[in-house]
Amino acid sequence: MKKIVAFGTLREDVVIEYDFSVPMKEMEVKLNKLDKTVGGSVNNTCYYLALKDSKLQVVLCTLNYTDLVGMLKKRMSCVNYRISTTQEALLQYPVSFIGLRENGEKQMISYDPIIDDSLLIDLLKKDVIDAEVLYTSFYEINERNYSKIATIFNKVIGSGKTIMVDLCPTLNRLSDVSIKEILSSTTVVSGNENEFKIMLKMLGQGGITDVFSEFPTIERIYVKKGERGASLYINDKQEKIDEIHIDAVVSDVIKNTTGCGDVFNAVIIEGMINTKDYQKTLECAVKESGKIAEGGLPWIKE
């Protein structure tokens, strides 16, 4: 059974219908429809991945927010998803407010930072030993932990395993030093166009070619492009960048905007392990991630 280990924080996700054209003044006015779930970007990816392929063992290393862990374990329907927690019980947990646009796309409004993740680093060191893939998001990386995480990444990458990191819209809260250290020990990067623009600006780079040149360990870059689908850029190590592009899927309901990066990344991880067929995997990722715009994702419903 192939093992995927992820490093991520559980959160209470509060999804609300929100008019982004009108600045929020009073939260009460905006709570037309409120949906609370146990979330966190990395957890969502892990949960979907475990549901999609029962032959994979998926492990989430996370802080022991007892209420959220209990809620998540109670509703989990897959035996191949394991929550590995630190020993210390934590009663306070982070909350994310997510705005829901009329077209089904979601956008982060605000989120609480990680409280303390020092014990989580030690947990990750143990669980990652026999993993095929290590996955996390820049949501989980900060100025306190990036050096320790990069050290773990370097050991994993030295054994020929895959390290995938997802970009996030709050990337600019990090220093360019921390971003560079993480990318220097990463093999796969995923994110949307806006997140890549933020990253390129912070690093003073002009495009994908510059990223591959500065970070030779990066083999593949996935870019979600909204209504234009998604692209995969492959570094063939011969001063040539290969590109695979998949257009957005159009249905009678709504145009697929590849709106859910959590699902997109789960499909990419499964493809990396099972098929190695980059084009087929990208096609599936575009299709699956677009389902959130056609009525949501059943696995996050209580």
What are these regions (language model features)?
Residues M1-V59, L68-M71, I254:
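Glycine-rich phosphate/adenosyl-contacting loop at the front of the ribokinase-like
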Residues K3-V5, G206-E302:
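Conserved phosphate-binding/catalytic region of the ribokinase-like
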Residues K3-V5, Q107, E132-Y135, V188, ...:
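Structural motif
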Residues N32, Q57-S84, L91:
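A glycine-rich beta-to-alpha transition motif near the start of alpha/beta enzyme domains, typified by
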Residues L49, N192, G261:
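Short, conserved phosphate/pyrophosphate- and ester-handling motifs at nucleotide-, phospho-/glycolipid
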Residues Q87-E88, I98-R144:
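Conserved phosphate-binding/catalytic loop of the ribokinase/pfkB sugar-kinase fold
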Residues V95-G99, Q107, G229-Y233:
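Short beta-strand scaffold segments in enzyme catalytic cores
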Residues A150-F153, I157-T162, C168-E243:
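Conserved phosphate/ATP/ADP-binding segment of small-molecule kinases
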